[in-house]
């Protein structure tokens, strides 16, 4: 997926579609591309689409069929202007049911890049980096404990690292397996009770 984003602006089509489960990094990758490309972010129901389109556009999670016509016109304007559209979605457009057929067919014809949920090794490495970025030393046994008990997504990793950091600061304890166990067993809304 990163290689395709790096190929911009030499995409073979006006659009590129990133497909993957929640928390797999689609939005993050789209935001990286947005900054690199100087792209706008599509806001459903936002400003009227002006032609010619002056910047590439990032559409994140186009899940509401009520915005299909707006996205369809955006796609056509992008294609006519020689710009690009990056779409991040959980379901490939070919499997969109009850959606605007013209939008579905155009996005189905665009190149699709699948991003899978991260595996244990990647989640462990990401969590180690997240802790290191906050200058927190956490042992491998803590990371192993967490990875085996958490949802496999970057967002879940970020939230868990934040919760552990907050619990560590609140209790003045190092982040260890016992503290990790307490945090995992405590619903997020009850974190202050740890």
Ranges and model annotations:
Residues 34-45:
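Post-Walker A helix-loop "phosphate-sensing" segment adjacent to the P-loop in P-loop NTPases
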Residues 13-29:
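Walker A/P-loop nucleotide-binding motif
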Residues 168-185:
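Conserved C-terminal helix/linker of AAA+ ATPases
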Residues 50-89:
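Conserved nucleotide-sensing/catalytic segment adjacent to the nucleotide-binding pocket
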Residues 93-108:
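Short regulatory helix/loop adjacent to the ATP-binding pocket of P-loop NTPases
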Residues 144-148, 155-169:
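C-terminal helical "lid" of AAA+/P-loop NTPase domains
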Residues 110-122:
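Conserved AAA+ ATPase "SRH/arginine-finger" region at the nucleotide-binding site
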Residues 1-15:
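Pre-Walker A (pre-P-loop) alpha-helix and adjacent loop at the N terminus of AAA/AAA+ ATPase modules
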């Amino acid at each position: 997926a990163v290689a395709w984003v790096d190929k911009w602006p030499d995409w073979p089509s006006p659009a590129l579609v990133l497909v993957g489960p929640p928390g797999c990094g689609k939005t993050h990758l789209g935001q990286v591309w947005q900054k690199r490309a100087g792209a706008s972010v599509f806001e459903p129901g936002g400003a009227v689409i002006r032609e010619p389109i002056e910047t590439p556009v990032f559409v994140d999670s186009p899940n509401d069929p009520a915005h299909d016509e707006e996205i369809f016109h955006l796609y056509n304007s992008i294609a006519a202007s020689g710009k690009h559209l990056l779409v991040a979605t959980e379901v490939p457009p070919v499997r969109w049911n009850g959606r605007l057929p013209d939008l579905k067919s155009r996005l189905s014809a665009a190149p699709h890049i699948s991003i899978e949920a991260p595996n244990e090794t990647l989640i462990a490495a990401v969590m180690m980096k997240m802790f290191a970025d906050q200058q927190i030393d956490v042992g491998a046994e803590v990371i192993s404990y967490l990875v085996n008990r958490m949802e496999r997504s970057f967002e879940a990793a970020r939230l868990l690292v934040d919760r552990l950091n907050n619990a560590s600061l609140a209790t003045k304890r190092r982040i260890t397996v016992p503290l990790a166990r307490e945090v995992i067993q405590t619903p997020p809304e009850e974190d202050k009770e740890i």
